[in-house]
Amino acid sequence: DVYKRQNQDEAVVTPLLLPDTPLVAWWPTLCPPDPASSSVGKLAQRRITNVAYDGRVTGEDLRTLSAGYTPGDSDMSWAAITLWRGVVASALDRHPHEPVQSVEVAGPAGHPAPDFAAGWLLDRLAVPVHRTVTDSQEPHFPVTHLRFNRETSHVDVDVVDERTVRVCVP
């Protein structure tokens, strides 16, 4: 197994490092279950994985990666929804400012971005988050629908096409 050659990895990588330069480790395909504990991951301040590299992500893959999470870890699927997260934050920053009671997140089963989005919203809002599966194959916006349920109104963020996201606010 490639991750069991710990002494070899460190011996090869260490001489290439510049002193006082932050190190980022990137696994573009298969990553170790606990990137921060791997030989290269121990040397890095940031660790970037790509759990969706082969398009066959399972819930078990996400649970394994989540169990090994350490501050400084990130995934390309999380980075892929950066603009979407900005739209979501902007949508919530509009009147009326009511507390969110629950959230609905939808996206394709085989893409981890909707799961990352649901986890982020659960962590930030501390409200129930319901994840539904769609048959959409829109690669540019893997989170195809989002609804913030509030007492008197809802906020919806929907993908219209590869260039358009519709935000419906009261």
What are these regions (language model features)?
Residues 2-3:
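Short, small-residue-biased leader/transition segments that mark boundaries at the very start
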Residues 16-19, 96-98, 140:
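Flexible, charged surface loops at secondary-structure boundaries
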Residues 118-120, 130-170:
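C-terminal structured domains
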Residues 7-8, 113, 140:
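Short, glycine/acidic-rich beta->alpha junctions
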Residues 10-85, 89:
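Contiguous mid-protein beta-loop-alpha structural module that forms a pocket-lining wall or clamp
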Residues 46-47, 56, 63, 85, ...:
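Arginine residue identity/basic-tract feature
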Residues 77-131:
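ATP/pyrophosphate-binding catalytic subdomain of soluble kinases
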